[in-house]
C-alpha cells in the first residue's frame, strides 16, 4: 500500500488548503491515480487496522440494491448512520442506481445484471460501465455518490476495474473504497470465470480534512506490512448469492486503528 501512503504524503505536502461544504476545511489536489495488482495481494491498508466487516457488508448491501440502513445495522455496521433519516432511509443512493436506475420510459435498469451479461457476451466492449451519478436524483440523495463511476476491462482472461471518484476523503474513506472495489472485482471475476487483473483508482478532488492532518502524519510514520490474501468461497457462481461467510482474510497484520472524526 505504498501508493496510498504516497498519496497521503503528496496531499499533506503539496495540497492546496480550501474551504468545503462541511465547514471543516480541507487540503486537496485535483487529479490523481493509483494502480493495484490484485494478484499481488488484497489491497487492505496495513498502516492502520480497518474494519473489514463494514466493507464487506456495505458492498453486499449495495449489490442488494438496498438504500435503508436497517440491514446494515442488523449486521453491526454503522458507517451510514449519520446520513440516514429517522426511518433509516438514504434516498436513491448507490444500491438504487446500480440495480434500479430509472429510465425515462418508466423501466428500471439493473446496471449490475447488464454488466455481468456483457462481460460474458461482449468481453471486448468499451461499455462495461456502471454509474451511480444520476443528475436527476442528486437532490433526493442523503449524500451524492463520491465513488460515482466504474468500468471493467478484460485482457488475456484477466478482469481489471477502474473507479472514478469525484470526491475522496483520503484518511477515512479511500482505504474503504480501495478494498471495496478490489473485492467487487474479485467477485465479478469469479462468477465470470476470469482471473483478477488490476484495480485502478482515479480521483477528482482528493482531500485530507484539516482535523485529520495529525493522524495522517502519524500513519506515515508507520512501516507497512505485507498485503494479506482474500479467499473467496469458490462454490459461489452467482454474484447476488454471496454472503459475508464466503470471504476469509488471511495473513492480515496491521498497525492499530487510528481514530479520526467524520465530516458530515
From Swiss-Prot:
Binding site for (6R)-5,10-methylene-5,6,7,8-tetrahydrofolate: 51, 169, 263
Catalyses which reaction(s): dUMP + (6R)-5,10-methylene-5,6,7,8-tetrahydrofolate = 7,8-dihydrofolate + dTMP
Protein location: Cytoplasm
Major subcellular site: cytoplasm
Active site: 146 (nucleophile)
GO molecular function, one term: thymidylate synthase activity
HAMAP family hit by this protein: Thymidy_synth_bact
Role this protein plays: Catalyzes the reductive methylation of 2'-deoxyuridine-5'-monophosphate (dUMP) to 2'-deoxythymidine-5'-monophosphate (dTMP) while utilizing 5,10-methylenetetrahydrofolate (mTHF) as the methyl donor and reductant in the reaction, yielding dihydrofolate (DHF) as a by-product. This enzymatic reaction provides an intracellular de novo source of dTMP, an essential precursor for DNA biosynthesis.
Similarity annotation: Belongs to the thymidylate synthase family. Bacterial-type ThyA subfamily.
Protein name: Thymidylate synthase
Organism the protein comes from: Bartonella tribocorum (strain CIP 105476 / IBS 506)
Organism lineage string: Bacteria, Pseudomonadati, Pseudomonadota, Alphaproteobacteria, Hyphomicrobiales
